[in-house]
Each structure stands twice: as C-alpha cells, then as structure tokens.
Amino acid sequence: YLVDFSIPVHSDNLAYTLNAIAHSNGDFTQPPHRGIGWSIFLSTFFSFVDSDNFLDYSNLSRIVSISVATSSIFLIYGVARKFFDERYSLVTSCLFAFLPHLNHNSIMGLSEPIFILTILASFYFILNNKLKFVTISLILAGLVCWIRLNGLIIFIVISLTYLLTFKKSQNFLRNYGIGVIFFILVLSPMLLQKYEQYGDPFYSSYQGSMFSENYEQLISNIDSNTKSSAFDYIQNHGIAAFFGNFLLGGFVNSLNILFQLSIPYLFILLPFGVLFSLRAFDQKSQYIKANWIFIISSILLMSVIISVIPEKRFLFFLMPFLVIFSVIPIQRVTEY
C-alpha cells in the first residue's frame, strides 16, 4: 500500500530505468556517475516487456526492487545463523524487515536493495575459509562493483574482514589470491568498457573532484571540470583541515546518519549490543570480530565520501550488520 503505481519513476530511479531500457535494446554504454549492475539486472526483466507506456517499465522496476529487498530478509536469516540459533535468527530477520528507511527505499526502484543483497551474500560466504566459499564471496564483491561506484570500497572491506579474521588459518592467502583472480575476471568487462569510453578503466565524473569543501562545491567543480585533489586541498587549507574535514568530519557524519537510520528501535538495542559484543559468549568470537571489522572499516573508508555527500542511502548497506549486534541484548535478556 506504500507504492504508488500511478506515477512513473523520477530522479535517480528514472535514470536506472532508462538505462535498463537501453540495455534491453543492446546499448551498454556506461554513465559516468553511476554503476550499471542494477540496470543490467533490470534489463533482463524488461526484455520480456513490449510496451510503449513508460509507466509499465517504471512499475516493473519497482516490483523487481521490492522482490530483491524481500529476498534480503531470507538471506539475513542465513547470515544470522552464524551468530544465533533459529529463534534469534528469526528475530534478526524481523528487525531487518521492519526498518522503515529500507522499506521506503525498496519501493523506489533504486539500486540499494540489490546492493545490500549482494553485500550480504558476499559477507555470508567470506565467513567460511574454504576455497570455494572465498571464491564465491569475491565474485560477489566483483558484482558489487558493477552495481555502485563505491563497490571497490566494499571489496576492500570484504578483503580486510577475511584477512584479519582468518589470518591464522592454513592456506588463507592461497584462498584469497585465487578469489582475487576471479574478482578481477568479473570486474574486467566493466573496466574494459570504461577504458573504451573514457580512456580510463576507473573513470568517474567524481574523479579528481571528490576533495571539495562541500556537496555544492563538488557539483560546481564537476560542471566546470575543475579538479580538486587531496594534494590541492592540503596545499590550500593545510593538513589539519584535511583530516578534520574529510576524516573526522566524515566519521562524525557517518555516526550521525547511522543514528538517524537506527530510529525507531535500533537506537535502543544497538548500544547494549555493541557493549555485549565486546564480551560475547553465545556467539563465535571469530564471527563477532568479522562483523566489527566490516562495520568499522566501512565507516572509515566511506568517511571521505560521507564528509562531502552526507547521504543516508550510502550507509544503508551497514544496517544488516548493525541489526545483528542489536539482537544480542534481546538474546541476553531472554536467556539470562
């Protein structure tokens, strides 16, 4: 009942839908400021639709988005089983399913639902040190890079999670190395296409302008093709201002955003969950450590982006991992 099927998509979801229509007609041109993974996924469904009414494509994108978001509820149950028994895994799924910000986003036809789903799947497989699971995890990390431009950050986060969690395990470097090869194979078609289009396999319209003082200046720099590198910022404002604005400022912005996303109920549970996770005895310490590494490294690596673009959507992918910590106090109160 939250979905209005009477109006077409607009803004970012309009661009994704138009790109998906183009893909279904054989045009795989990559836009300079967003990934094409979601639009390619949508195009597989659009290829079965023959309509002159754009509203039909808009509504199909919404339906697919809702379906993907719904499937994440089942996947987080599987991830939660690494931490809890069946009862509390079900609680984890329920808490995740009723997060209002994610529910609202899921009806928009945007890329966040499939982004979250793919990251969750990658994290699920990386919790196992067997070669086949590490390989699957890094293949999924490659798909994440297709979906969003910040997918490379997720690859680094997944890599850190694996390397720091399983550093004492036998063959962990061999498994990771083989997984990276598959990651590169998955990523290479996108990189080659970008190289053909822009002469740079890692091209983005934000490239060279990310270290702007604020979002307005970032857009102005992109429009005027003005470069603003980290070196330029340090030269003009000093190293202290650089760390204060992009690292500390981004970190504070991230915490503020996560607090807003934790309303209406996670903000009560999460502080206790964080505290109890430091002395977890009902969960494997290895998995708790992996969850901590994923959350902290994600916040730190996203700090520069969040300092300039404090957009809530950029941190939606962290919510499943915060929900896991939020279930720990429920388990403690119930069991002890």
Predicted feature locations:
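Transmembrane-helix motifs of polytopic, lipid-linked glycan transferases
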Residues: 60-83, 117, 121
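Hydrophobic, aromatic-rich transmembrane alpha-helices
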Residues: 76, 244-287, 299
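Perimembrane helix-loop-helix junctions
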Residues: 125-133, 154-187, 191-192, 197
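Short helix- or helix-capping micro-motifs
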Residues: 92-100, 124, 141-145
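Extracytoplasmic catalytic/substrate-binding loops of multi-pass membrane glycan-assembly enzymes
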Residues: 5-17, 29-45, 52-59, 109, ...
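Loop-to-helix entry region of an early transmembrane alpha helix in multi-pass inner-membrane enzymes
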Residues: 32, 36, 40, 50-71, ...
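Hydrophobic/aromatic-rich transmembrane helices and adjacent perimembrane loops
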Residues: 17, 106, 112, 144-149, ...
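Short acidic/glycine- and proline-prone juxtamembrane loop motifs at membrane-interface regions
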Residues: 11, 34-35, 101-114, 311
